[in-house]
Design a protein with these regions (language model features):
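Short turn/helix-capping motifs enriched in Asx and small/polar residues
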Residues: 1-74
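Acidic glycine-/aspartate-rich tracts in secreted/extracellular proteins
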Residues: 4-6, 33-34, 122-123, 175-179
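Short consensus segments that form the blades of beta-propeller domains
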Residues: 103-109
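A short, charged
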Residues: 50-84, 155-186
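A structural/positional concept
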Residues: 97-98, 116
Length: 207
C-alpha cells in the first residue's frame, strides 16, 4: 500500500528499481531473473515523458546492487517514512543484508540513516529492523550528536508493538565514508550518542 510505512515485501524480489532523488521513492521498473535486486540509473525522456535506463558512458548506470530480496518494494520510501523490515526465514532478507542496504542507501543519498534491530520480548534472534526516515538527516560529522534524525524514535504504530513488548538488540546509525575515521568508528551501544554500523561489525568480527 502506497501510504503504509511498513515495507510490504515482494516475495520474489529480483527486480530493477529507479530511485527518485526528489521524492525518495523507489519505483519498480522491471522484473528480472536475477537473484538480487538493484537500483539502476534512469533519465527522463522529455519527448515521451517516460524514464529510460541510462546507457551512455557518461551516465550512471548502476546506483545500488546486490540488494537482498524482501527489502525493496514498489513506491517504498525511506526518505519520508520510517520502515520496518522483517528478517530471517524463507523469503526474507538477512540482518546483514538489510545492514548492507542501509549503508549503501546512506552513501547514495549522502545522509546519515539510523534505526533499531529488535525482536519480541525474550527472543534472542533479531526478527525486525526498524529504519528511521532520513528526510532531515545531516551529513556533517561535527553534528553527529545533535542530529536527531540519525537516532529515530521507535514508533509503535509503525512497528506494530509497544517498546515494552520487544527487546532492542542494536541501535545503529551510519556515518558516510567521507567522514574521518575517528567519526566513523565511534562505539555503537544501545541508547548512547555514538556508533557507526562499521564499528559494530568490526566488534562482531573480532568477538
Amino acid at each position: 500500500c502506497k501510504n503504509n510505512p511498513v515495507n510490504r515485501i515482494d516475495p520474489d524480489g529480483m527486480d530493477d528499481y529507479r530511485y527518485d532523488d526528489k521524492t525518495g521513492q523507489f519505483h519498480l521498473m522491471k522484473q528480472t531473473d536475477d537473484k538480487t535486486d538493484r537500483v539502476l540509473g534512469y533519465h527522463l525522456n522529455k519527448k515521451t515523458g517516460e524514464y529510460k535506463q541510462n546507457t551512455k558512458w557518461h551516465q550512471t548506470k548502476t546506483r545500488m546492487e546486490g540488494i537482498e530480496k524482501g527489502i525493496l518494494s514498489d513506491e517504498v520510501n525511506f526518505k519520508e517514512n520510517d520502515n520496518v523490515i522483517s528478517v530471517g526465514g524463507e523469503g526474507k532478507p538477512t540482518v546483514t543484508g538489510v545492514e548492507n542496504f542501509v549503508i549503501e542507501l546512506s552513501e547514495m543519498v549522502g545522509l546519515e540513516i539510523g534505526g533499531f534491530e529488535y525482536s519480541k520480548k525474550g527472543v534472542t534472534e533479531v526478527s525486525n529492523v526498524y529504519i528511521g526516515r532520513y528526510q532531515s538527516s545531516k551529513d556533517n560529522p561535527s553534528r553527529w550528536n545533535t542530529d536527531q534524525r540519525a537516532y529515530p524514535s521507535f514508533n509503535p504504530r509503525i512497528a506494530g508493538s509497544m517498546p515494552n513488548e520487544v527487546d532492542f538488540h542494536v541501535d545503529f546509525h551510519t556515518h558516510l565514508s567521507k567522514f574521518p575515521e575517528s567519526d566513523r568508528l565511534r562505539p555503537s551501544g544501545l541508547y548512547t550518542p555514538g556508533g557507526d554500523m562499521e564499528y559494530k561489525r568490526g566488534q562482531q568480527s573480532n568477538g
